[in-house]
Amino acid sequence: MDPGSRWRNLPSGPSLKHLTDPSYGIPREQQKAALQELTRAHVESFNYAVHEGLGLAVQAIPPFEFAFKDERISFTILDAVISPPTVPKGTICKEANVYPAECRGRRSTYRGKLTADINWAVNGISKGIIKQFLGYVPIMVKSKLCNLRNLPPQALIEHHEEAEEMGGYFIINGIEKVIRMLIMPRRNFPIAMIRPKWKTRGPGYTQYGVSMHCVREEHSAVNMNLHYLENGTVMLNFIYRKELFFLPLGFALKALVSFSDYQIFQELIKGKEDDSFLRNSVSQMLRIVMEEGCSTQKQVLNYLGECFRVKLNVPDWYPNEQAAEFLFNQCICIHLKSNTEKFYMLCLMTRKLFALAKGECMEDNPDSLVNQEVLTPGQLFLMFLKEKLEGWLVSIKIAFDKKAQKTSVSMNTDNLMRIFTMGIDLTKPFEYLFATGNLRSKTGLGLLQDSGLCVVADKLNFIRYLSHFRCVHRGADFAKMRTTTVRRLLPESWGFLCPVHTPDGEPCGLMNHLTAVCEVVTQFVYTASIPALLCNLGVTPIDGAPHRSYSECYPVLLDGVMVGWVDKDLAPGIADSLRHFKVLREKRIPPWMEVVLIPMTGKPSLYPGLFLFTTPCRLVRPVQNLALGKEELIGTMEQIFMNVAIFEDEVFAGVTTHQELFPHSLLSVIANFIPFSDHNQSPRNMYQCQMGKQTMGFPLLTYQDRSDNKLYRLQTPQSPLVRPSMYDYYDMDNYPIGTNAIVAVISYTGYDMEDAMIVNKASWERGFAHGSVYKSEFIDLSEKIKQGDSSLVFGIKPGDPRVLQKLDDDGLPFIGAKLQYGDPYYSYLNLNTGESFVMYYKSKENCVVDNIKVCSNDTGSGKFKCVCITMRVPRNPTIGDKFASRHGQKGILSRLWPAEDMPFTESGMVPDILFNPHGFPSRMTIGMLIESMAGKSAALHGLCHDATPFIFSEENSALEYFGEMLKAAGYNFYGTERLYSGISGLELEADIFIGVVYYQRLRHMVSDKFQVRTTGARDRVTNQPIGGRNVQGGIRFGEMERDALLAHGTSFLLHDRLFNCSDRSVAHVCVKCGSLLSPLLEKPPPSWSAMRNRKYNCTLCSRSDTIDTVSVPYVFRYFVAELAAMNIKVKLDVV
C-alpha cells in the first residue's frame, strides 16, 4: 500500500477534452485505479480471509473429542480449501467457470465449493485423513477466488460486466449484497470506561471498569472486562457462548504464571509503590485466593477447572488443569499466545483501572473514533466460517450417536465417510446470513448486533452504488438509544469520517462515510523483529528493570502485547525514530503502523504509554510529513497528538509536523462532487449527499445484460460544465447524473411557490430530463406445476385467436412490442393435455418489451421453462416529479410553461427553468449562485470550470473571478440580464439573475406514487376498502384529514366518504334491549306451510315488533361481536 501514490496525480482541473477524444468509449487497457481503490478494503479483507486467514482459523479449531465404546475418538480439521465458482460435474456447458453475470441472470448464488481434510484418530493414534465436501460458500466478486480476477476491461465486457467493474460484493439469489462495515472497539487495547449500569451487576460493584476487545489473527473475538469493586478488589468478567462469567482477578493471575504472591504483588503496584490503598487492595485479592486453599498455580488451575468444566463441554478424561487451560485459551486475552503475556496484560489493565477509580486517569470515550476500528467483510466471513466448521464437527458427533443407536457402527474410513455426509451443510447458513443480514450464532462472534449485517448494493445510480462501499455504520442497537452522544461529530474524526455525508433523518450520525483519502488496513504483518528493534532504541524488556523508577517510565505495548518499559525522557526520541523508519520503509516497519505516545501531563488525562499498532481493520489516511518530505499514513489515535496544518500559512517551524495533502481531504467521495460546497450552509451539503444518491442517471452501461427488478436511465444526460476536480479523478462522465439547464431566478408565475419550479415546455419536448425505468419479471413455469411434473413449456396453440399477432411462436412477446393493460403477456402449453394458457399484462402503465432472456438450471439440462422479461417504461417528466440542483435545492415540477409565454433575453435566449428567488435567502446556497455564473462563463468561453471547494477565499473571490470572465464575454459582471415578458413583450424592470446550473432529476415520480380509485377490492373482515397502491387500494384517511374536513364545515362530505362509500351496512337492532346481536331471522318454514314470510325475532325479548333497522359501519358490527366474545355486552339507545 503506497500511501501517497494515489493522490500525486490528481487532475489539476476538469476538462471536456476526453469527450471529444476519438478513443472515447473504447475500453482502456487497464481499469481506472481510483475506482478500484474504493472497494479495496472489501476485496483485500476477503482475500486474506480465504487464504492466510482460513489456514489460521483451521489451526485455531481444537480437535473434537468424544468417547465411543471405551475408546477416545478425535476429529481434527487439518486444512480447508475454497474453490473458485465452477459448474457441477456432469453439467452440459461449453465452459466450466461460472461468472457473476450468469448468476445475476439466473437469480442464483455466486459460490465456491468448500472442502476440508479431516484427520480421525482413536486413542491418540491417527487412522487416516478424509477429504470431505462441506458445502458451498459465497464468493466475493473480483476477489482472488473470482473468475473475473485480473481481467482487463475488454475481457470484462466480453463476460457481460462493466468495463470498470469494482467488485467487493456477493451475489445471493441474483441480488448483489454488501457486508456493511460496522464500528467496533479498537482491538487489543484496554479502554477505561465509566458506566453506571455496571453497579447492577452485583453487590459491591461500581461504575468503573476497563474493557478490552481481544481479537486473534484469524479474527476470532472475545470481549473481556475488569470491574472495580467497592472494597478495592477487581473482578474479571468474560463471555463464553453468550453467557456471562465472573472470576476474581487473583485467581486468574495465579493460574496464568507460577510466580510467587510477592512477585504478583510487585507487578501490580508498579509505579505506585507508595500507595497504601493499592497495596492493601492487592493483598486482599491475593488473600481471597488463599482462603480457597489455593496457594500454587496447579491448585488454582484445578480449582478453576472444577468450577468451569460443566460449562466448557470438555471431554470427561480431561483433568481439571487442562479444562482450566482451555478456559484461558478461549476466553482470557485470546490475542496473546503465552500465559506470561496474558499475566502482564492483566496487570497493566489493573493498574489502569485503579488509576481511573482514583481519578488519576480520564475515561476513554468509546464513542470516539480514537478507540474504534471497523468490521471488514472478510473479518465477518472468516469468523462465521470458523464457527460453522466447529459446528460441523459437533454435528458429526450427533450423527455418529444416531447411527450407533440404530445399528452397530465400526470405526473405519468407509463408515466415517458415510457419517460425514450426514453433517450439517454449510451452504444454507451462509446464504441465510447474506440474504437476510441476520446472524445465527451460538457465540455472537464478539459482535454488538446480530441483524443488519448485509445490505443490497442497489444501483439506483452510480453515486449510490459507490457509497455502499464507503459507508460505516455505528450499529443497529444504537439507533434505539435516546441519547445523542453516539451521534455527535467529534473533532477526532477529522479526515477519517466525512462531516456532511450522513443522513438527515433517523440514522443521522450513526451512518457515516469514510473520507476520500481514508483507507482501511487489511493486511496482517508479523512483528517478531520489532521488539528487538525497540530494545536497541532504549526500551527495557518486560522482564528487566529500567534505570529509573516505574513511575518515571512509560509502558510499551505492541498490538496489545506488553513489550517493556521506556524512560519518559527517551520516549519522544524513540517515537520519532519509529516514525522515521515507518515513512522511509526501513527496519521492516510497516507503513501503516500507528505510533502513539500518550505523555504524562501531571493532570487526570489519558493513561500514559507508548502504544504501537499494526493490526488490520484500523482507519488510516495520508498526510505530508514536513520533516521528511514524504507522505505518511497516520491513524486515528496518533492524529490527536500531532500538529497537522491545512494551508501553507498555517505551518509554524518547530510546531507543525504534518500538512494535509489538499484542503478538501476531509470530505467523502460523494461530498467531493458538490461544486463550491464551502460556500453553502452545511445542511444543504448533507441534503445533496442524500439526493445525489436518489438521482436518475446512468448506474451502469450493461442494461442489456442486467435482470434487476428496477433500473433507472436518464435518456439525455450531459457532462457538467462546472465540477470539482474529483469528478474527473473518478471518471464520473461515464455515469452522468444530470443536465445543464439555463436557470433564471425570477418569480414569474404563481406556480413556483414553496420550492416549485417552472420548466420550459419546448425544452421538455426537446428531451429535457427524459428518462426510462427498466423492470424485469422472472417467469418460472416450474412454480405453476406439481412437483415431479415437467409438462409445461412456453408456446402458443396454432390459430389461437387470443394471441393473434401479439405473441411470437415461442409464446413470448416480440422484442420492441408495446404492451397495454389487458394485452397477452405470455403463453404456455401443457404437453400432456395440449391445453394452452394465456397470461395477460396487468399493469396500468404502458411499456415496451426491451429484451427477453431464457434461463436454465444449474446443470444446463433445464427445458424451456424459465424466462426473464425486461420492460422499458417511458418516464418523461410530469407535474409533480422531483428535481434538485447539486446544492440541496430540491423542488417539484409544477407547470410546463409554453415557450412563447416564457421570459426571454435580448438575444432571444429562453430559460429552461424558472427558479423562485425566495429559495436562496433562508437556504444560503451561495454555491448555486456561483455555479450559475461559472456555468454561464463556461458556456460562453468554451471552458470547464473547477468547482473544487476551498480554492477561493476572501482574498481570491469567486465573484471577482467569474464576474470578470462574464465581463470579458460582454455580459454583466454580476450575472444578471434584462429579460422581456413573454406575455406582454415589455422589458421587465428588475435585472434577472440567469445562468447555467447542473440539474438532477430524482427518482421520486408521481407515476410511482399517485393512488386513486372509485370501486375495488374490500377487506374480508371489516368490509372496508383495502390499503396499498399495488392492489389498487384506497388512500389512507387519518385523524388529521378528518379534522381538516370538520374545520372546513364539510361534515356531509365526511359522512359520505367515510361511511357511505366505505363500509355502510344495514343491521337489525332490538329497540327494547338495545342489542345488535340478538335479532335473528326465523328458521325456514316447512315445505307444507302456507306461510312464507320470515321475520326477525329478538332472542332475548322473544318479540318481533321491537326490531328496527339502522345504518352502521360494518366494522362496528365486527367490533360488537369481538366484545361479545370477551363477555362484554354493548347496548344501543335507538331513537
From Swiss-Prot:
Known outcome of mutating residue 682 to R: In TCS4; uncertain significance
Record-linked PROSITE patterns: RNA_POL_BETA
Any one of the GO CC terms: cytosol
Cellular localisation: Nucleus, Nucleolus; Chromosome
Cofactor notes: Two Mg(2+) ions are coordinated by both the catalytic residues and the nucleic acid substrate to enhance substrate recognition and catalytic efficiency.
UniProt keyword annotation of Nucleotide-binding present: no
Region: Fork loop 1, residue numbers: 439-453
Reaction(s) catalysed (UniProt annotation): RNA(n) + a ribonucleoside 5'-triphosphate = RNA(n+1) + diphosphate
Keywords: Chromosome, Disease variant, DNA-directed RNA polymerase, Magnesium, Metal-binding, Nucleotidyltransferase, Nucleus, Phosphoprotein, Transcription, Transferase, Zinc, Zinc-finger
Keyword ATP-binding carried by entry: no
Site (Active site gating): 687
Binding site for Mg(2+): 755
Region named Disordered: 1-24
Annotated GO biological process: embryo implantation; neural crest formation; nucleologenesis; rRNA transcription
Positions of the UniProt region annotated as Loop B: 194-208
EC number: 2.7.7.6
Residues modified as Phosphoserine: 1051
One Gene Ontology MF term: ribonucleoside binding
Binding of DNA template strand, residues: 1036
Binding residues for DNA nontemplate strand: 1020
Quaternary context: Component of the RNA polymerase I (Pol I) complex consisting of 13 subunits: a ten-subunit catalytic core composed of POLR1A/RPA1, POLR1B/RPA2, POLR1C/RPAC1, POLR1D/RPAC2, POLR1H/RPA12, POLR2E/RPABC1, POLR2F/RPABC2, POLR2H/RPABC3, POLR2K/RPABC4 and POLR2L/RPABC5; a mobile stalk subunit POLR1F/RPA43 protruding from the core and additional subunits homologous to general transcription factors POLR1E/RPA49 and POLR1G/RPA34. Part of Pol I pre-initiation complex (PIC), in which Pol I core assembles with RRN3 and promoter-bound UTBF and SL1/TIF-IB complex.
Chain's role: Catalytic core component of RNA polymerase I (Pol I), a DNA-dependent RNA polymerase which synthesizes ribosomal RNA precursors using the four ribonucleoside triphosphates as substrates. Transcribes 47S pre-rRNAs from multicopy rRNA gene clusters, giving rise to 5.8S, 18S and 28S ribosomal RNAs. Pol I-mediated transcription cycle proceeds through transcription initiation, transcription elongation and transcription termination stages.
Entry's disease: Treacher Collins syndrome 4: A form of Treacher Collins syndrome, a disorder of craniofacial development. Treacher Collins syndrome is characterized by a combination of bilateral downward slanting of the palpebral fissures, colobomas of the lower eyelids with a paucity of eyelashes medial to the defect, hypoplasia of the facial bones, cleft palate, malformation of the external ears, atresia of the external auditory canals, and bilateral conductive hearing loss. TCS4 inheritance pattern is autosomal dominant.
Family, as annotated: Belongs to the RNA polymerase beta chain family.
Stated name of the protein: DNA-directed RNA polymerase I subunit RPA2
Organism in which the protein naturally occurs: Homo sapiens (Human)
